Amino acid sequence: MTDKRKDGSGKLLYCSFCGKSQHEVRKLIAGPSVYICDECVDLCNDIIREEIKEVAPHRERSALPTPHEIRIHLDDYVIGQEQAKKVLAVAVYNHYKRLRNGDTSNGVELGKSNILLIGPTGSGKTLLAETLARLLDVPFTMADATTLTEAGYVGEDVENIIQKLLQKCDYDVQKAQRGIVYIDEIDKISRKSDNPSITRDVSGEGVQQALLKLIEGTVAAVPPQGGRKHPQQEFLQVDTSKILFICGGAFAGLDKVIANRVETGSGIGFGATVKAKSDKASEGELLSQVEPEDLIKFGLIPEFIGRLPVVATLNELSEEALIQILKEPKNALTKQYQALFNLEGVDLEFRDEALDAIARKAMARKTGARGLRSIVEAALLDTMYDLPSMEDVEKVVIDESVIDGQSKPLLIYGKPEAQASGE
């Protein structure tokens, strides 16, 4: 039997690299007088991939931004919270400098500086952590502390956090060990009182105990597929001492704990300083004075607090800050919706009074920056529903009355005779 190509010639083709014939492989790719089979292509890909892995750590070593550069990058995406940005910039820089130079410097062992972010909802805690990970080009994952339980109980094991991080970097252990983990709602795992409980608290103090070693640094055995359902599979060994943990929470009521401590320490009698009610510190001012003893009273155990030596407090966003958030960051909400409307070939304009109205509504809801999107979405819903079916619309204008629900957006048409209001 004669082997023939589709073009009718009787020549049998062979891979120029491994020598296999066209019938021994699935695919043979032709070049100028040379051929390569699919098996050799796969082998080349594997070789290149391994070389990239070896080169990547050297590239990362030379790419560590300074605290000033980190702060400038955060300014592009996060409005306000200047002190928190400075604290985060220094802590993150020191953490990755420690990784780059090893755990010791001149015989001195460098400790790990995990971070605790304290601030009201919608103040930018999650956004700060996400922006840092994006700047440093490291794997990033978020975990909700309220879903975690002690091992052996219904809920997520704390090791599942590391498993999620591995998923983000395609189970590359070396890459995962340079990652950032953000644990949200950390205040929700506080114990019910500051006295040790005689009953088992599997979702509060129990989770704090389970997180201790993970945050401080241990070699966690993580199943590649996660969970507790595959006990026989080979486990991945991940050194968590190289992972930066950032914990965040609103800590509602912590300001009262701090106020009680501050007022108690102010003294009584003839030498005491008498303060008028108007002199009472704001929530942000009180949170900036937080001490470990306040967090213990709130319900965090001392050992857990000790693993989070860097504390940054975030202030509640003012109306002016919310207006800035709407229009100034690189991925500002108004810019996102304008880009969305541009895909339909329509310009979207937010007038200044509309931005003021959005900020006022968000302040009234006490949801911070998180509530801005829902307000804008509600105002634009009908327009986004109708716009794809409409013709000749060139521009949509949003003013204060639209945000307040008193009128519909103004639609400006391309043809002057067809110009009309959406009312």
UniProtKB/Swiss-Prot annotation:
Pfam family, one: ClpB_D2-small
Coiled-coil zones: none
All copies of domain ClpX-type ZB, residue ranges: 2-56
Top-rank taxon: Bacteria
Keywords, sorted A to Z: ATP-binding, Chaperone, Metal-binding, Nucleotide-binding, Zinc
Presence of keyword RNA-binding: no
Alphabetized GO MF terms: ATP binding; ATP hydrolysis activity; ATP-dependent protein folding chaperone; protein dimerization activity; unfolded protein binding; zinc ion binding
GO biological process: cell division; proteolysis involved in protein catabolic process
Presence of the UniProt keyword Plastid in the record: no
GO cellular component: HslUV protease complex
InterPro entries registered for this protein in UniProt: AAA+_ATPase, ATP-dep_Clp_protease_ClpX, ATPase_AAA_core, Clp_ATPase_C, Clp_protease_ATP-bd_su_ClpX, ClpX_bact, P-loop_NTPase, Znf_CppX_C4
Gene3D superfamilies, alphabetized: 1.10.8.60, ClpX chaperone, C4-type zinc finger domain (6.20.220.10), P-loop containing nucleotide triphosphate hydrolases (3.40.50.300)
Binding-site positions, Zn(2+): 15, 18, 37, 40
Binding-site residues for ATP, renumbered to this chain: 120-127
Similarity comment: Belongs to the ClpX chaperone family.
Function: ATP-dependent specificity component of the Clp protease. It directs the protease to specific substrates. Can perform chaperone functions in the absence of ClpP.
Quaternary structure and partners: Component of the ClpX-ClpP complex. Forms a hexameric ring that, in the presence of ATP, binds to fourteen ClpP subunits assembled into a disk-like structure with a central cavity, resembling the structure of eukaryotic proteasomes.
Protein's UniProt name: ATP-dependent Clp protease ATP-binding subunit ClpX
